[in-house]
Amino acid sequence: MKWDSVYHNQLEILREALSKLHRPHVTALIDKILSTQGSLFFVGVGKNGHVAAKAASTFSSLNIKSFYLDPVEALHGALSVVTDDDLVIGVSKSGNTSELYAVFAALREKSSNISIVLVHSNDTISNRCEAISDFSLFVKISHECDMFNIVPIASVAAFTVLFQSLAIHLAHHRGLSLDTFLENHPGGHIGTLRKQ
């Protein structure tokens, strides 16, 4: 497989994923985030753990209080940081990841008031995490882009683009100013822009 064909294939899958998104569910997720009084916690396992961490980083950089919740740490004491005012967003291709399910189940046992949302690409009915979520957002991924159709390439790209798009939408909706954005970024090239 040539790299440019893989690149092109990912773009096609992203277009398909966008066209198949159930807009009312996207709106529901946006509304859920906007109505959250506490923090957002993104959680995922494996490659989707990196997706979750990137989402939390982007949201927080746009002045939306967000954190990455490591699933192993969560099951060994870190659940203490999640309160009834928070929203937990899980990322899983299958919706059946055992570690993510364990986190969701532990959160449910801790409090029925904690909001849990699952973002996944499993269109079958065997989705354990979805069963204990408040609601879920299905992201259509027709196939991965590798020779085995198993390496999480297209799914990671689709989840990442979705979260980046939501972050910008929400920051704009909340009226994030350039001054506030720059205040939160005193370092690097962005930090130099504030001094100009």
Predicted segments, located by residue:
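An N-terminal, well-structured beta->alpha segment
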Residues: 1-35
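Internal, active-site/partner-interface "lid" segment
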Residues: 145-146, 171-196
